[in-house]
From Swiss-Prot:
This is Holliday junction branch migration complex subunit RuvA. GO terms for biological process: DNA recombination; DNA repair. The keyword Nuclease does not apply. The RuvA-RuvB-RuvC complex processes Holliday junction (HJ) DNA during genetic recombination and DNA repair, while the RuvA-RuvB complex plays an important role in the rescue of blocked DNA replication forks via replication fork reversal (RFR). RuvA specifically binds to HJ cruciform DNA, conferring on it an open structure. The RuvB hexamer acts as an ATP-dependent pump, pulling dsDNA into and through the RuvAB complex. HJ branch migration allows RuvC to scan DNA until it finds its consensus sequence, where it cleaves and resolves the cruciform DNA. The keyword Lipoprotein does not apply. One of its GO terms (cellular component) is Holliday junction helicase complex. Has three domains with a flexible linker between the domains II and III and assumes an 'L' shape. Domain III is highly mobile and contacts RuvB.
Length: 191
């Protein structure tokens, strides 16, 4: 298994790059976001997910950060989502945008590239469960500095439910202190 690869970008293609590591060129499939940030000659580090397809061909999928890698792993566990489809979702949406789409039940965010309404609904349903099970340190910038959310999660509330309640409170009272947000959230969650 390969955890990460650091090397020089030798070629950039439509859906992959060739990364030269010790004079060996590795074909690594990446999202369009990664393709846009790379230039030939750049020295980059990619976190690698290895997949062996039906034809017994090993394919490498590369990510600039662990969040995208973790989301690919979650997405491919959903029935109807393969590595190519998961990578197309990550080309379109960042982990933060996926989280937001799941929280807001936004099926439209996932639709396209072979994903219809039924599969988009399944993605949301299954990711709600998986996101709630993620360790708190694996959450993202949209929630990582939120003390009120951390407090509710430490009290045993589900991450998505707590996030929704806090967002609602903050939209109604944007100047509320952390203590006020927690107090209002506890009242709302205990109803």
């Amino acid at each position: 298994m390969i955890g990460s690869i650091t090397g020089n970008v030798e070629e950039i293609r439509d859906s992959y790059i060739i990364l030269n590591v010790g004079n060996i060129g590795y074909i690594i499939y990446v999202s369009h976001k990664v393709l846009q940030t790379c230039k030939v000659g750049d020295n980059i580090k990619l976190y690698i997910e290895t997949y062996v397809n039906r034809d017994n061909i090993t394919q490498l999928y590369g990510f600039l950060n662990r969040q995208e890698q973790d989301y690919l792993k979650m997405l491919v566990t959903i029935n109807g989502i393969n590595y190519k489809t998961a990578l197309s979702i990550l080309s379109k949406l960042s982990p933060e945008q996926i989280f937001s789409a799941v929280v807001n039940n936004d099926k439209i965010a996932f639709k396209g590239n072979g994903i219809g309404e039924k599969l988009a609904g399944r993605i949301i349903t299954e990711l709600q469960y998986k996101i709630n099970k993620m360790p708190i340190e694996e959450t993202f910038s949209i929630i990582e500095n939120d003390d009120s959310l951390a407090a509710l999660i430490s009290l045993g509330y589900e991450k998505l439910k707590a996030f929704n309640v806090i967002q609602e409170i903050k939209s109604k009272t944007p100047d509320a202190s952390t203590q006020e947000v927690i107090r209002k959230a506890l009242q709302k969650l205990s109803q």
